[in-house]
Each structure stands twice: as structure tokens, then as C-alpha cells.
Amino acid sequence: MKMTSIQQRAELHRQIWQIANDVRGSVDGWDFKQYVLGALFYRFISENFSSYIEAGDDSICYAKLDDSVITDDIKDDAIKTKGYFIYPSQLFCNVAAKANTNDRLNADLNSIFVAIESSAYGYPSEADIKGLFADFDTTSNRLGNTVKDKNARLAAVLKGVEGLKLGDFHEHQIDLFGDAYEFLISNYAANAGKSGGEFFTPQHVSKLIAQLAMHGQTHVNKIYDPAAGSGSLLLQAKKQFDDHIIEEGFFGQEINHTTYNLARMNMFLHNINYDKFDIKLGNTLTEPHFRDEKPFDAIVSNPPYSVKWIGSDDPTLINDERFAPAGVLAPKSKADFAFVLHALNYLSAKGRAAIVCFPGIFYRGGAEQKIRQYLVDNNYVETVISLAPNLFFGTTIAVNILVLSKHKTDTKVQFIDASELFKKETNNNILTDAHIEKIMQVFASKEDVAHLAKSVAFETVVANDYNLSVSSYVEAKDTREIIDIAELNAELKTTVSKIDQLRKDIDAIVAEIEGCEVQK
């Protein structure tokens, strides 16, 4: 019997995770992730490139061609289209086939990765390809102490990835690569705890954030994530909406070098061409990219919670166009609102930003209160949503989503209490599609729903010292048991009567015992 796509996916996931654990040996999975993910990426770009060269002609098998038949024109055209070049001898399938007997495997892999990256030098794709394999260190002692040990471990990784049934490019099953990559990242993140949560937003939460940012837009110029992580949030927008809706592609900035490379690989693995994405490395708050690319019609982000930043120690930042309008900087110990103000500055007049936030920023005083006042007074806050606890990797905190808009049609602020909308899984809670649909329905309608949603007048928020905590406006359902006092009194009367009767019975027994003792 033929397996369904769901069964195929489940089997593929089981197989991938087993391979990932088998090949790492005693090395921690978190430390070894770049080899498994890197090998999967290497296989993807090899097959993707072969498919491009063959162009549907069954008489051509690029992997079997000799490198010498490649002309400069073929190479030039390919790099302009795909962004990189891979010779037949450098393809994953050819390297993996000889991996177990290749005494120079680690050196050969390094040379191939250098060649792929250098093929883009001088082309528009150079920045998108440069350093992609930097974390696939073929000389690392994580692979083993000797060259022989390193080669054996590398061969195991290549053979494992080679064995994955990811379909054929001619069968249009490209998404299986992206799905496999996302599954691996998700599992690595789940097992890494806090450090994993910093680079991956679970798909179910990403889906909600993407829908919030894209709601009501028939098309957006481009989508942006100022704390891109592994790119999972940006890619949810691609999965949720047709390609033509996002016209100019995907933009993001990431501070961690390894995660930055994972994000770029993730884009390729989801079949986003180099000219449709731009992921930059650097500190978004102090070294922001894409000033010339803004404004963005859709912004999604799950920035790190309450991280330290330079803040007021850098006197130039208060005059930065991103922060100056608020008249105050986010506290040095809590950069949350710095990310919010950055996103607001990059947002277009027709766009929305959906940002995951630590709940404390919505009620604390000081600079954070002043920033809330700026946001509310200028009517930028569309909705604040409180989520259930334990939805994210590495933290059990119940976080909020802040939705910013520059095109509101009224001055109310909507509050949604989604803290009871979750399904309990083994280690984490999840949002089901039904939960997301329910949140989106009340978000779109702006209707008041008891214990779930309330749209609050601007004056009320002002009178409440610009407190934006959902619990201040949406009354939680009283889950305490309702007690019938009359019924309780009746039960109490019956119980007292029984106690009185028992006392009389006990007194009678005692009197009888004492009478017997007197007779003796």
C-alpha cells in the first residue's frame, strides 16, 4: 500500500533524526548540527544545480559528465542564474559514492566548498554565497582526533544524508528538502533548551505571526525580520502565502555567525533564489542594514528577550532616527523596546509588524512606559496578544505578540487573551490550526468577546498609565466552582444533626459502660 504524504513525512523525519544521532557518536548534537545540516544543504544545491543544467532533458545526466566539457559560457550563465557553480566531479552524489574509500575526504570536501563559494566572486550573488560552508569545518577535532577518524565520521554523515528519500527534482518534491531541514533545526533547538530558542521559532507560532503581519494584504513589497535566527519566521510567510504576494523577497539580519549561515542555507533549501533574499550578519540595534531597502510592508520578529545593549552609553543613539521620536532609549538591561522601535521605523505606511515580546515591557515604568506612551499617542499599537506558556523552546514564559500598524482606522487598542488556547504536547505546548484561526478571527473582526478579546478606547489606556498588559483589560474567566449557598446550608444542617445524634449515641454507650463498672 502506498504511504500518504503525512506518513512519508513522518518516516522521513524518523529516518533523519536517527541518522543525525547515529553519525554524531559521542559528540553533543548541538555541536554537531552544522555537519548534518551542511551535508543536507550540499546535497540540495548539488541536485538543484544538476536539475537546472539538465533542464528536463532526460538524455543528459550532469553527474556523469566530465568536468572538461564545461565551457566558460556555460559556467557564466549558470552563476548568473543560480548564483554559484558546481562541476560534475564536485556534486554531492559523486563525492558521497566514494566517501568510504576516499583517504582525502576531509581535504576534498574543503576544496569543493571553497570552489563553490569562490565561483560567485565578482557576481551579484557573491555576498549570498560567501561563507555558507564556514561552519562545516572538515579539520575540527569534533570529527575525530586523526585524519582517518575525521574521514570516517564525514563519510558516515554523507552516506546517511545520501540515503534519505527526498524525491527527485523532476518530480517537484523540492519542499521535502526544506521540510527536512526545518525538522532538523526544530529538533536541535528543542534539545538545546535556551540556546535553541534563540535561533528558532516553532512553526505553529511562526504561522500565527506571519498571518498577523500579512493580514488583509493582497501583496507586500518585501518581508523583513530584524532578528532572523534560522529564517523560520520569514519562511512561514512563504508557506502561508503565494509567491506573487511577496514581490521583492525576504530580508533579515542575524547577529550570530553560525545561525546567519543556517538562515541563508534555509532560504536556498526552500528554493528561494539568491536574488530573492538578503540575509545580513551584524547587530541590528547598533549596525542596522537595509536602511536603503525600507520601508517594508510586513515585518515579523522574535527578538531575544530582555538582552543587554549599549543604550545610553552610546550618545549617538538618542539621535538615531529609529529611537529619537520616542525621546528615550530602551533600558540598557532590557533591549526589547529597541527592537520594537527599530521595526516601527522600518515599517511602511500600509504595513504591519508582528513582534514577540517579553510581557514585562507592557507594564513596567520608567523609559519603557515613556516608549509605550509614544506608541499609543501616535496610534501605532493595533493589538497586544497574550499567549499560553511554554510555547517556545528554552523558556516556559507566557510571551506576548505586539502588532504595530501605521494605517489604523480608529484609535482603539485591541487586547486578546489567548493564554488558554493551546494543546499540551510532550515537552511543550503548541497552537493548533484551530487556535490560530480563532485568534485571527477576533483579530480581524476587532469584536469584543467575553474573556477573550476587548478593544479599548485610547482614553482608557491613557488613564491606566499606558499599561498594555492584556490582563488589565480582558477579564479572565472565573474557573472557580460555583457554590449554591442554600444547598450548602441544608447539607450543613443535616451534617450537624447527624453529629448531634452520634454524640447522643456515644453518651449512651459511655453511660452504659460506666453503669456496668458500678455494678461490679
Question: Can you describe what each PLM-predicted range is?
Answer:
Residues M1-L208, L212-A213, Q217, D275-T284, ...:
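Non-catalytic, mostly N-terminal accessory regions of nucleic-acid modification and defense proteins
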Residues K2, Q7, E287, E293-K520:
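A conserved structural/catalytic subdomain of Rossmann-like adenosyl-cofactor enzymes
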Residues V36, F177, V220, E247, ...:
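A structure-centric signal for secondary-structure junctions around beta-strands
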Residues H170, D242-D243, L269, F392, ...:
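Generic marker of residues within folded, mature protein domains
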Residues L176, I223, S333:
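Glycine-rich, flexible loop segments associated with nucleotide phosphate handling
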Residues S195-S301, S306-K308, D313-L317, R322-G327, ...:
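Conserved S-adenosyl-L-methionine
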